Amino acid sequence: MLLFALLLAMELPLVAASATMRAQWTYSLRCHDCAVINDFNCPNIRVCPYHIRRCMTISIRINSRELLVYKNCTNNCTFVYAAEQPPEAPGKIFKTNSFYWVCCCNSMVCNAGGPTNLERDMLPDEVTEEELPEGTVRLGVSKLLLSFASIIVSNILP
């Protein structure tokens, strides 16, 4: 009986404190909030509503050179689970408008940054030219002799 009274005396102040001081201990999650192109660094931070307990980062490929990066608060992270994702559309291949990188987390400003290999993925367009072997000429720079040889060979062959 004495043990029960001691336990009750120890727990009662904790229950009273949590009931009366709930407003001071409200979990106010803070997340980055932005929608930008090709940049995972977002300076804006917002305080999420009380019932929302997760931050998200979604990046979607717009085209081969641009990513739309969206960061905000969310209460639903099912988009990261394979079982919750919609099935693939049959017969259509989408080269753009697909997820590039997603993140869902539940701590203060946890959606900062993004993947570090973005620079390697977004390479500039460059033309690759191979060296021509000896004796060949570039298209449009052909010599008169090669033109005549081509005409003669095309007339000889059936």
From Swiss-Prot:
CDD domains recorded for this chain? TFP_LU_ECD_GML (cd23555)
Q: Which residues are connected by disulfide bridges in this protein?
A: C31-C55, C34-C42, C48-C73, C77-C104, C105-C110
Q: What induces it?
A: By p53/TP53.
Top-level taxon in the UniProt lineage: Eukaryota
Report the leader peptide range. 1-17
Single Gene Ontology BP term?
negative regulation of cell population proliferation
Compartments annotated for it: namely: Cell membrane
GO terms for cellular component: extrinsic component of membrane; plasma membrane; side of membrane
User: Membrane topology for this entry?
Assistant: Lipid-anchor; GPI-anchor
**Entry-linked InterPro entries:** CD59_antigen_CS, LY6_UPA_recep-like, Snake_toxin-like_sf, Sperm-ZP_regulatory
Task: Describe the task this protein carries out.
Answer: May play a role in the apoptotic pathway or cell-cycle regulation induced by p53/TP53 after DNA damage.
Protein name per its UniProtKB record: Glycosyl-phosphatidylinositol-anchored molecule-like protein
Say which species the protein is native to. Answer: Homo sapiens (Human)
The taxonomic lineage of its organism, from the top, reads:
Eukaryota, Metazoa, Chordata, Craniata, Vertebrata
Encoding gene (name) = GML
